Amino acid sequence: MRLWNSVINGNGKVKEYDYKGKLRFEGEYLNGKMNGKGKEYKDGKLEFEGEYLNGLRNGKGKEYDYDGKLRFEGEYLNGEKL
C-alpha cells in the first residue's frame, strides 16, 4: 500500500506501508522509482537510511540491525556495498 504525498507522475515524496500497516519506505520517487534520500523499514523498524538512484541504494548509506544498532555505514553502488 502506498500513501503518496505531493506526487505528480511518479515524482515526489512517498510513504509505503506493508499489508499490516507498518511503514516500509519513506522518501522520494522520480519516475516511479526511489531516488534521492530515503529510509527503509522492516517490521516498522529502521533498517536502512541513505541515498537511492533508479530504485537502488546508491551513494552514502547506513544499515541497522533489528535492535537499532548501526551494522554498516559506507557507500553503495547499484544496490551493492562497496
Regions found by a protein language model. Name each.
Residues 1-82:
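Glycine/tyrosine- and acidic-biased, solvent-exposed loop/turn segments at the edges of beta-strands
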